[in-house]
Amino acid sequence: METNAVSLIYRCRVGERMSQHDTDGRVSVYAENIGGISQCDVTFKPGVNVLRGRNATGRTSLLNGLAGVLGGTAPVLKGDEQEAEVRLEFNGTTYDQQYTRKNGTVQAAGQPVTERRDLVDLFVCLTAENPARRAIVQDGNLRDVIMRPVDTGSIQRRIEDLQSERNRIGQRIRAIEDDLDQRTSLTSRKTTLVSDLDECDQEIEELRNQLEQFDADPEEAEEIEQALTSLEERKQELESITNRIRTQEDTREALRDEQSELQTEREAIETSEEELKRIETRLSELTSRERSLATTINDLSAIVDFNEDLVSNADSDLLRSGDAAESPVSKLNPMSETVECWTCGTEVERNRIAGRLDDLRDLVDEKRTERSEVQTEIEELRESQQELQEVIHRRDEIGQRLSEISSEIAQRDQTLESLSEEREDVHQRLSELEEFVSEREALQESELTEQYQQLSELEYQRGQLEEELSAVREELAELDRLENERDQLQAQQDEIQAELVSQRTQIRDLEESAITAFNDHMEEILDVLRYKNIARVWIERKEGAEFNSSHGGYRGGSATKFELHVVRETDEGRGYEDTVQSLSESEREVVGLVVALAGYLVHDVYEVIPMMLLDSLEAIDADRIAALVDYFADYAPYLIVALLPEDADALGGDETSVVPASFASEE
């Protein structure tokens, strides 16, 4: 038999997981007051473990107890016992569950292997009541079984968080790119300033050379030079302070404009937390109502289908004809025939049962209509909820920004007051210097004084150029930093987008993986078991409503469906599609087990629980049970199977551990 690629991948993964455990180690299970068991202590080895025994020997009770300590549904307690216990020693760790019967219910306490009850009940404990097996036997919803462990709510919340983060990063990138647009003009300005500064330095150098040629009094020349230098320095300082004051005033005015705009926007916002709470409360009620309606519709549909089968099956043992069954009227009109009701035992005409079924069908239609209305209202409320949340978030942002603006305006006012005082001081010192220079009018009129004044002006001009050039260089350095930040943000944005795509397709990917796993394993199983006339059993993914995070899940109410197909083959080798109902009980049980195996692998259950429990395989013949167990053993490090003696004898191999089942207490 050629192994499918998907099956090979899963075998490799399970093999890697098995290597992480002590594969020579044993699993010890102790159970007390579980089902028909008073007390038992069993040890299992890695590989296949067979619980060999007849019915009523406690095999199923032990498996149910083991499922409970693994993390599954609590088992049934023995008789009238009020307390029970299951203990599991595995891989160096002891797990336990204590069960107490209280007020008609069983309460559990202790440390199970996992808190994921759904994984254990769906894909680990494959007893007669396993949902995957029942879904095939009862023609149930396969997708619901396989996809039940997926937390769509968590996926939705993660998508919303990623969208918010992506939008925030996008806004920051756009702001940075607006700033980067200034690079060309700043670079050009830097080139101009460097050129102007070189020219200014050259003029200063030439003027100083000219001053050295004058034969003026050195002390007097030095005194006037110092005075003029101080005068120009004070002018430069005064201009710098004036520029700073102008900048602070412009910034304060811009803040006040922004403050006014935000206050106007906040006044225009109309929102109500009470309305949001009302919507959330209503959403909770409607969601609960939708689940309740879905359950009711499923239950009523099952009742209608069951009773339709009974009414249409004249040979049903549950419908026993009354004394008037052989009357001429009954033969002419079978619907008037009286039968014994299979629920209460009274005599009733068939047409009354048919009428009751019509009433139930009408009720199912009413419930479906009501569910559709509820789903529509849920969608509308979720849209309103999102709009309100966005408005409230914007209002909070405005309030926070207004608070920041108020603080900034107060800070600007304080800075302006300090700068005004500083400007007055500089004015005073400047007046004193101007008075000193004016007293030396005669010297100022000389050529020497004019040249010193020109030198002072050039040095002042040079200082202005250096200051502006330094500012331009700082702005260019900031643009370099912003460019690096933009590149990092774009990389982060790409990662977020990739995760968004992954989250949005996660449901579909899981569905397709589950279907591929089922189809591949089913193909291999059919090749191994060789059922007559069955060429193929496969699942087709039927598109339904797509998962939409902005509307809280699947729009329209119906998700994707898994449709099971059966292809048979005539004696001449011609294939044709048959119905699922045509499958024998044995074939249905095998299909159900493969559905559970697909879920076990797709959801990586073996990473948490490297164990699988099989029971109620009597519908399958012994040779096929042996082949099935051998196949499943490749995917479960510990496979525990409850079998009748004649079925257990068909299993061979040194790796199979047989445990005689005699756990049930004698009454």
UniProtKB/Swiss-Prot annotation:
SUPFAM superfamilies: P-loop containing nucleoside triphosphate hydrolases. Gene3D superfamilies: P-loop containing nucleotide triphosphate hydrolases (3.40.50.300). Signal peptide: none annotated. GO terms for cellular component: cytoplasm. GO terms for molecular function: ATP hydrolysis activity. One of its GO terms (biological process) is double-strand break repair. Residues 153-295, 355-517 form a coiled coil. It is found in: Cytoplasm. Keywords: Coiled coil, Cytoplasm, Plasmid. Pfam families: AAA_23. It comes from the Archaea. Its main location: cytoplasm. May play a role in replication. NCBIfam families: ASRP (NF045487). Belongs to the Sph1/Sph2 family. PANTHER family: ABC TRANSPORTER ABCH.3. This is Smc-like protein Sph2. It comes from Halobacterium salinarum (strain ATCC 700922 / JCM 11081 / NRC-1). The gene is sph2.
